[in-house]
A protein has these predicted regions:
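Conserved pre-ATP/AMP-binding loop-to-beta segment of ANL
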Residues: 21-24, 152-174, 181, 205-211
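ANL superfamily adenylate-forming
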Residues: 118-166, 273-291
């Protein structure tokens, strides 16, 4: 069998500069003006950052980077990756206490941060005496100086003449930690870049010079891998959205063809289109879409959470393909990717970089882009793999003969009834997706009974004149129960006055089954 290989980030930058040259790669708004950076310029500035870092220390360092997705963030992340050091990205809203703990666990020696984190960065210097370097990313003038002083024409030019071991760790990404302590996923260059070297089932999504709007944070592998690494390979323009408050404005300014989203964003944008059509019935669907998305939108690629198939249908009525993929950081990112010929209820088709099997209902993955492990957590790493080396995703699913993947729940969330039957709470929760009275729902087991805890959409109830919310929800559940499997029958509806408790990443916290 041919050994799996993939280019390094440096090789991607070199190829991009050679192939696409002065074509625009990165666009962003600064001080009210649109600025552009070509493939050549991004390569040049990334190499300058690489030389700057190596001029500070020839020792391999773990470098934390805290900030929003701006141009300096991207060149720093690239510079770290091509310098042979290890990038460790964090969310900009991380607390000082958590950052100090994770810095210690991840052996951080250098911190790059944006202006908004400056005060906390000073506190971290006191809490983390092992930090050797700390640099503010928000200082544009400082970075322009780095780009110039460490250019290919400078005395430091030779510092970028290095060969990176593609099998060594290049990035550590901490998982959200919905259960227990956060774990640092170690990925190699081979995993990071190799994961995007798959065959696109939809050949018209990623074409050179197409415009992609990047709205999700770069510290998530879904965004960095898709909006940066893959678009660098394919020659797309990447427009940086910045704040979510600017999304609607920037959609109309940049007029993208493709946007990577989470389902919540897709739902919100759809509601805007519907509001325009409701306000003026004379407005055409095409014009309403253009008022929200601009004139070129064709694709929304969803990930990170369950996507209601009804939402897919709604978007197709607008002439937009909304499709989802599936992945996890531990697999290098993608496991399956969008395909507009696949079932709307699937998460696309498994990539040709991955092999998937279903063992006892669980989706398990074999891929050369799998993680090296959890940093300094050998026992936790071992638990993630089967005896024959397959990655355990923890998701329950089905795989068809034509490689379509379907997810039905989580292994850890299974409700095990006294008769031994396993019930996926997610499968029941999905049945509430079309009920406008339901804002949030959590299904769990309690003494061999299925409970549905619901936070209603009180605004909707008010508009529709629904006074007996409990009664209305019980009627809806009765209708569901008539066609449900015996094990899926909901015994009780509990109505909440407050939203369900969430994790740091915005996911609903699960309750343990009470036996």
């Amino acid at each position: 069998m041919k050994k799996f290989d993939a280019p390094s980030v440096r090789e991607l930058l070199d190829t991009g500069a050679e192939k696409f040259g002065d074509a625009t790669f990165i666009k962003f708004i600064r001080d009210g003006k649109i600025e552009e950076r070509s493939f050549k310029k991004v390569r040049s500035d990334s190499l300058a950052v690489c030389r700057w870092i190596r001029s500070l220390s020839d020792k391999r360092m773990h470098i934390a980077i805290i900030g929003k997705s701006n141009y300096e963030y991207i060149t720093c992340l690239s510079g770290i990756l091509i310098s042979g050091n290890v990038a460790v990205p964090f969310a900009p809203d991380i607390s000082v206490e958590e950052a100090a703990e994770l810095f210690k666990r991840a052996d951080i020696e250098m911190l790059l941060y944006e202006d908004e984190f400056a005060e906390n960065a000073e506190k971290l210097k006191e809490l983390c005496p092992f930090l050797r370097f700390s640099v503010n990313l928000g200082n544009g003038e400082e970075f322009e100086k780095i780009y110039t002083d460490y250019s290919e024409n400078s005395e430091y030019a030779s510092l970028s003449d290095i060969t990176v071991d593609k099998n060594a760790c290049c990035v550590i990404i901490f998982t959200s930690g919905t259960t227990g302590i956060k774990k640092g996923v170690e990925l190699s260059t081979l995993a990071l870049v190799g994961n995007i070297m798959y065959h696109d089932y939809c050949t018209d999504i990623f074409l050179p010079n197409d415009v992609s709007l990047s709205v999700l944070p770069m510290y998530h592998i879904y965004c960095f891998s898709g909006d940066y690494i893959k678009n660098l390979k394919d020659g797309l323009q990447v427009c940086l959205n910045g704040s979510m408050m600017d999304l609607i404005k920037n959609l109309k300014i940049f007029e993208p063809k493709v946007v990577r989203v989470v389902p919540m964003i897709a739902q919100s944008l759809l509601q805007r289109v519907k509001a325009i059509l409701a306000k003026d019935p004379e407005t055409s669907v095409k014009d309403a879409v253009a008022q929200v998305f601009g004139r070129n939108i064709k694709w929304l690629i969803s990930g990170g959470a369950y996507l209601n198939p009804e939402l897919v249908d709604e978007y197709e009525k607008l002439g937009i393909f909304l499709r989802q993929g599936y992945g996890m950081t531990e697999a290098g990112c993608r496991i399956s990717v969008p395909d507009n010929t696949a079932s709307r209820e699937s998460v696309g088709r498994v990539t040709d970089v991955c092999t998937v099997r279903i063992q006892n209902g669980e989706i398990q993955v074999n891929t050369p882009t799998v993680m090296l492990g959890y940093y300094k957590m050998p026992e936790e790493t071992k638990e993630m793999f089967t005896e024959d080396g397959w990655l355990k995703t923890g998701d329950i699913g089905e795989l068809t003969e034509d490689n379509q993947l379907f997810i039905t729940g989580r292994v850890k969330n299974l409700i095990i009834l006294s008769n031994g039957e396993n019930v996926s709470p997610e499968a029941i929760e999905k049945k509430f997706a079309d009920n406008q009275l339901v804002s949030e729902v959590l299904v769990y087991g309690e003494k061999d009974r299925i409970i549905a805890e619901i936070y209603p959409d009180y605004e909707y109830a008010k508009l529709e004149g629904i006074d007996d919310i409990q009664g209305e929800l019980e009627k809806a559940v009765d209708r569901m129960n008539k066609t449900a499997k015996a094990a899926h029958i909901i015994s009780e509806v509990r109505v909440r006055t407050e939203p369900l408790e969430k994790t740091g990443s915005g996911k609903i916290k699960r309750k343990a089954t009470v036996l």
